């Protein structure tokens, strides 16, 4: 209710309410303040406010979500507002509001089923309720993972848990979720690589923080290779198709050179875990962890190609 909170600005995604999971690329995107969002959220339907970006959407038939908002990437006003109320030290975590991520949305807003590739997740529910469906990493084969849309550090499921289709994804019927409803004051610990689908049951505000684990360096190396492959393939497609491969959070297609630099960094960290990533270059001659040729040789090794063919054949059944 404070003027400082009402003036906070960010990007929101909006979509009609419905019974199926919505991908981010299928949403409307708009820039608005928290105050404009709250005026719309409290309305009974449409609002008569030409200056409010939400005015063209009927509140009764649409949801809105400001999700995955890293406080460090927002204006300093966000950190100033959250700093007095968000802290993780009581959980033995040396992080604060500036390290957190904000999720604010109306009932029906949701995040598709996905798996974070590194870190464990701590989630604090500040307002409203959220439903979480969690699946063990052992369920991965039943959830039909995909990297399209591509988002760094996220592996999505092709299964729509809101409207599952066992005829297309028969193994999904065997998946056993753990359902949790978070209420204000609750904190949820999401173990590494656990799949999760999240839906707001009311207008909801939550914050989370990811905590590094000792084996994250290996997962970052895998993510770097995934980015190289996606960059290489998407770059050879038409601009429209290539963009369709990317989640909106990615911003655009990286160049192959940029992706290789990230891979170089990731593998160098595997060699030297305590190395300050700001203190070395990305040129292979600067003690690089691998050469581009070595990467090509690894990806095209006969045993790797055999596994790829086997996976492709399984996907046709």
Q: Where does each model-flagged region fall?
A:
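N-terminal accessory scaffold of Fe(II)-dependent oxygenases
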Residues: 1-187, 195-317
